[in-house]
Regions:
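Conserved AAA+ ATPase core "coupling" helix
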Residues: 142-176
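AAA+/SF3 P-loop NTPase mechanochemical coupling elements
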Residues: 47, 117-135
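Conserved AAA+/SF3 P-loop NTPase catalytic/coupling segment centered on the Walker-B
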Residues: 54-57, 86-112, 139-148
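C-terminal engagement/docking regions of AAA+ P-loop ATPases
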Residues: 47, 87, 107, 219-231
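Conserved AAA+ ATPase small/helical "lid" subdomain
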Residues: 176-224
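Short glycine-rich substrate-engagement loop in P-loop NTPases that contacts/grips substrate
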Residues: 62-88
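Pre-Walker A (pre-P-loop) alpha-helix and adjacent loop at the N terminus of AAA/AAA+ ATPase modules
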Residues: 3-40
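Walker A/P-loop
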Residues: 33-67, 82
Length: 231
């Protein structure tokens, strides 16, 4: 009697399909999105990972608000939240926000209350249901009280096999790079910087294997290996 039943995907199951691997992290994000009450998630790890890709996927959600931590200000975010009441607040590189700018999130995330005093006048909103998703390159620069309000996920380094697969699929599928050039780029950059961003830069320019070798030999001689993280 069950042979004709089709398994229906939940609304959030389609998110993160473009991110290779990290299935456990994808599942955690989907569980947070499906939660009846706000659950906040912070992805922490070195640069050159796909942390930002998770936030970019969430930007397609209705009522989402994306913030670059390096340019964010407390006053600007408070003003936006008062005016628009976004359901999802997405903060990339939250560790680059000053402590005074991070602090306003404490009450919002803990109690759903947002208040502000200006020119001796106070305004406040209560029962704000805002999910906060953030990334951090250096979690030590995120206030400890703020860390405690997040479900913190520390990302693990990629193996060579994971780096190779991710780079080749990223270059061939998203950037339309020929497979042989993508493979050569992955192999070469692993020994130089192990940085996916470097692979993308080369993939966008190289039209042949000779181009890959030329770029790497002449312009990446002083690159230092980076720790690339899963996620």
């Amino acid at each position: 009697m069950f042979t004709n039943l089709m398994i229906q995907r939940k609304p959030h199951d389609r998110f993160f399909d473009e991110i290779i691997g990290c299935e456990d992290i994808k599942r955690l994000f989907r569980m947070a999105l499906d939660s009846a009450q706000p659950v906040h998630v912070l992805l922490s790890g070195p640069p050159a990972s796909a942390k930002t890709l998770f936030l970019q996927s969430l930007m397609t959600l209705k009522d989402s608000y994306f913030v670059d931590g390096s340019n964010a200000s407390k006053s600007g975010m408070i003003e936006y939240i008062f005016d628009n009441k976004p359901k999802y607040l997405l903060i990339d590189e939250i560790d680059k926000m000053a402590s005074k700018d991070q602090s306003f999130l404490l009450n919002l995330m803990e109690t759903g209350i947002l208040s502000e005093t200006k020119h001796r006048k106070t305004r406040a909103i209560t029962n704000v249901k805002t999910w906060v998703f953030a990334t951090s390159n250096n979690i030590s620069k995120v206030m400890l009280p703020l860390q405690s309000r997040f479900f913190v996920v520390n990302l693990e380094p990629y193996t060579y096999e994971q780096f190779y697969q991710i780079t080749v699929e990223l270059l061939t599928k998203q950037h339309k790079v020929k497979e042989e050039i993508a493979e050569a780029t992955a192999n070469t950059i692993w020994d130089k910087s192990a940085n996916v961003r470097d692979c993308v830069k080369i993939g966008r320019m190289a039209r042949s294997l000779e181009d890959v070798i030329f770029i790497v030999d002449n312009f990446m001689m002083h690159s230092q290996p980076n720790v690339l993280v899963k996620g």
